């Protein structure tokens, strides 16, 4: 895991090799959210969705338009699809109530015929001291070992 900042944005980047072709890995991360849920800690996503609803946000109730396909502009729970590069990249922008702005990006590239390199990057642009406190307060949850991912 790499934790860094760039121009006031906190970046948390994780990479791992996955024993699956890139197309299969891309298919998995493009089906996240909605009825499918998330790859680990669904309880934490549910709690975050509940808190978001209490704060007047959209929560997790939106689900998603299609369980298998994403397009730019689609809602995925409390995220909005900001970028899609078929077979390669999915970037989600947070629409939940936050003291800042956040994005979650999944990127995959072939390492060889049967192995892929998966990169997950969380971006957070904190708004003031409350944004920094939010990031570091919830960092232990974000720091869950990526081997818990069910790839």
Describe the function of each predicted region.
Residues 57-75:
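Secreted/surface-exposed cysteine- and glycine-rich disulfide frameworks
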Residues 72-78, 99-101:
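Short coil-to-beta-strand transition motifs
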Residues 79-80, 106:
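Small-residue-enriched segments and motifs
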Residues 19-23, 83-87, 108-117:
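A short, structured loop/turn motif at beta-sheet edges
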Residues 1-60:
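Hydrophobic ligand-binding cavity/cleft-lining segments
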Residues 94-141:
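Beta-strand/loop substructures that line and gate deep hydrophobic ligand-binding cavities in soluble
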Residues 67-68, 90-97:
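Short beta-strand segments that buttress and anchor functional surface loops
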Residues 24-29, 81, 118-120, 149:
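Hydrophobic pocket/interface hotspot
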